[in-house]
């Protein structure tokens, strides 16, 4: 055996007994534990530990359970006690205080700086690491660099199911598991911002410039006095049969009662339902029904359309078997809210009330300076009739959605979202724009609609009854004193409007295109979008020749439905992004009451909800939005940056949002005049 010297020991050349090494370091031999000492020597010699002292000093410090000196060159921002399998989970409360330091491909060591936070000694912790290192399988790398990309990465959807008792619970609220993430940042080296935030330089002038670039004819459009011109001029309209009486509604608009928008994006003024305005709207929305279709056998064609509908969309009719029970539950729930003193009387279901919408839908066409926008009309039953039919159609719609093929999405009811686990990149898109949708529907649409309702679970007597009072109806406007007859056309405000429009759109679409070529199909009223991986084949001429519809196939096709673009993230998940032009056209409303801030605050809440996820867009998603915007509007997508910044800035707080609207001083002056009139100013008695 070689002679023992302290220099040989330090150099590792000495191979004597372990207790001799222990004694040479000046440690007490009475405390000697051979197993523990050998384990410490192996740890130091293996190179797993990082320390800035000599080998013998490290052995002495580890034996005395003292802290090793840190290496000044290695900066560790945050250090936390080691977490072993026996450690109590309640010891470590903050994820941001621990960090894994990777030293090699095989080994991952957790740097330990505070041993009082855990129950194990340093020797026990190191022994656990050696046992894990001795296993045959390599240790997986620990990745804690979880960068926050978007709001949806905080949660993971576990499941989603329909709740039979209360459909409101099923509004896409599944159980979620929070994903705990953290960011490691050195406090000594502040992070410099190379690129400013999009909301830093937002102002009304730059936003108005972006709107003027995309909508050049909308910036200087002002129709404040257009309705006065209509009321004071001669009106020539042609009707086959219409009844008029003296109306008491006048175009007396108090402009000072409403907020005035600061953005000029082509928003129309509030329309008043005078008799002339009602006649213009009826002429546009109900009269002049297009006759584009050829002569067809209505009975045979309606049966073929109904069969094609079922084979294309419905995969399981079991959910609609119990629809009657659910209808009964809805009716009982509604019946409990009826006043027991409610007067029961008969109603003629063929009679509808009529009114015009005070809001005019903004348009993106560059024709506002040439053609005046016509308001839409609403044809509806009374509250009692709608309350009687709504439970039946609501129950049927809920069960109908459950029976649809997984490729079909109707963003309404229990599934009121367009978020999907579906990648829309590198696809072919088909968007069909159906104009004059309501008044173009005739006997054929009513017949195949009735047969579809019977096949998906609605009782035959109820379906026949509902369709019977659509064959011929009598519509009257009690304010404008206008009444006329109407047949077959869609009633725009009854209990079956959205569901019926969706069924008609789906039925016509399935008859014109083979639905097996599509991977996803989205329908909402008269809007439709189909996505395919191969070039789309079909016959769009059937929309005109068979169904009497004016159909326009959007070219180039983009993923756009319900005034929203569809984009995909890096993981292939699809979600909706609001159309920026449509959003800022809504901010030009001229019918927000200025009596108090409640009405304006409601507009702010709605805008904030729609823009909630816009600030979390990644650059990858913004580039998609720019491309789709360019394809749809034939405009440069660079203005998306201005829109994104404005969305974030004006949705931050109500104070920023309020700068988009101004209030005139006329209401304050009127209130002051009223106060002076009621209580005139008088000199004080002392004078």
From Swiss-Prot:
InterPro entries: DNA/RNA_pol_sf (IPR043502), RNA-dep_RNA_pol_alsuvir (IPR001788), RNA-dir_pol_PSvirus (IPR007094). Its EC number is 2.7.7.48. It comes from the Viruses. Keywords: Nucleotide-binding, Nucleotidyltransferase, RNA-directed RNA polymerase, Transferase, Viral RNA replication. It is an enzyme of class 2 (transferase). One of its GO terms (biological process) is viral RNA genome replication. It catalyses: RNA(n) + a ribonucleoside 5'-triphosphate = RNA(n+1) + diphosphate. GO terms for molecular function: nucleotide binding; RNA binding; RNA-directed RNA polymerase activity. RNA-dependent RNA polymerase which replicates the viral genome composed of 3 RNA segments, RNA1, RNA2 and RNA3. This is RNA-directed RNA polymerase 2a.
């Amino acid at each position: 055996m070689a002679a023992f010297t302290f220099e040989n020991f330090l150099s590792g050349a000495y191979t004597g007994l372990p207790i001799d090494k222990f004694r040479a370091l000046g440690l007490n031999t009475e405390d000697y534990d051979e197993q523990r000492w050998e384990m410490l020597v192996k740890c130091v010699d293996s190179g797993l530990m990082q320390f800035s002292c000599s080998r013998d000093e490290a052995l002495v410090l580890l034996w005395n359970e003292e802290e090793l000196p840190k290496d000044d060159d290695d900066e560790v921002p945050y250090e936390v006690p080691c977490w072993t399998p026996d450690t109590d989970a309640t010891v470590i409360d903050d994820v941001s205080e621990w960090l894994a330091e990777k030293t090699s491909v095989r080994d991952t060591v957790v740097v330990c700086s505070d041993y009082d936070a855990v129950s194990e000694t340093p020797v026990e912790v190191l022994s656990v690491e050696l046992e894990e290192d001795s296993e045959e399988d390599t240790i997986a790398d620990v990745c804690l660099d979880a960068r926050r990309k978007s709001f949806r990465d905080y949660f993971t959807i576990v499941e989603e199911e329909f709740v039979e008792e209360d459909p409101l619970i099923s509004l896409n609220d599944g159980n979620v598991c929070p994903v705990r993430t953290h960011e490691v940042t050195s406090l000594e080296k502040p992070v410099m911002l190379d690129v400013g935030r999009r909301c830093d330089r937002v102002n009304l002038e730059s936003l108005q410039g972006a709107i003027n670039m995309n909508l050049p004819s909308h910036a200087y459009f002002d129709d404040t006095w257009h309705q006065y011109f209509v009321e004071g001029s001669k009106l020539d309209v042609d009707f086959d049969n219409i009844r008029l009486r003296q109306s008491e509604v006048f175009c007396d608009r108090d402009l000072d009662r409403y907020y005035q928008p600061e953005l000029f994006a082509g928003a129309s003024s509030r329309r008043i339902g005078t008799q002339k305005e009602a006649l213009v709207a009826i002429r546009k929305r109900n009269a002049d029904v297009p006759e584009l279709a050829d002569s067809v056998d209505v009975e045979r064609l309606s049966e073929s359309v109904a069969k094609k509908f079922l084979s294309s969309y419905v995969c399981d009719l079991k959910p609609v078997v119990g629809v009657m029970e659910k209808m009964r539950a809805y009716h009982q729930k509604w019946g409990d809210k009826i006043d027991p003193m409610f007067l029961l009387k008969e109603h003629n279901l063929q009679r509808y009330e009529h009114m015009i919408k005070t809001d005019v839908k903004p348009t993106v066409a560059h024709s506002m300076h040439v053609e005046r926008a016509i308001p839409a009309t609403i044809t509806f039953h009374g509250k009692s009739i709608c309350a009687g039919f709504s439970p039946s159609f609501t129950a049927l719609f809920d069960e109908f959605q459950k029976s649809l093929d997984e490729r079909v999405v109707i963003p309404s009811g229990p599934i009121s979202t367009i978020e999907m686990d579906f990648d829309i990149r590198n696809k072919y898109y088909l968007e069909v724009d159906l104009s004059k949708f309501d008044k173009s529907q005739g006997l054929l649409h009513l017949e195949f609609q009735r047969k579809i309702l019977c096949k998906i679970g609605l009782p035959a007597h109820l379906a026949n009854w509902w369709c019977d009072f659509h064959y011929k109806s009598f519509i009257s406007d009690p304010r404008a004193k206008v009444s006329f007859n109407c047949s077959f056309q869609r009633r725009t405000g009854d209990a079956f409007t959205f569901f019926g429009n969706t069924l008609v759109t789906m039925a016509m679409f399935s008859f014109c295109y083979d639905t097996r070529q599509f991977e996803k199909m989205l329908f909402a009223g008269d809007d439709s979008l189909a996505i395919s991986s191969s070039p789309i084949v079909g016959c769009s001429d059937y929309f005109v020749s068979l169904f009497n519809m004016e159909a326009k196939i959007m070219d180039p096709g983009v993923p756009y439905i319900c005034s929203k673009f569809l984009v995909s993230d890096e993981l292939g998940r699809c979600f909706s992004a609001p159309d920026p032009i449509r959003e800022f056209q809504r901010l030009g409303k001229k019918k927000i009451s200025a009596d108090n801030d409640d009405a304006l605050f409601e507009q702010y809440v709605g805008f904030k909800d729609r823009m909630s996820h816009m600030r979390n867009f990644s650059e990858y998603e913004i580039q998609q939005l720019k491309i789709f915007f360019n394809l749809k509007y034939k405009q440069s997508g660079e203005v998306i940056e201005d829109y994104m910044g404005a969305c974030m800035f004006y949705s931050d707080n109500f104070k920023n949002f309020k700068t988009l609207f101004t209030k005139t001083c006329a209401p304050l002056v009127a209130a002051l005049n009223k106060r002076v009139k009621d209580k005139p100013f008088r000199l004080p008695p002392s004078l």
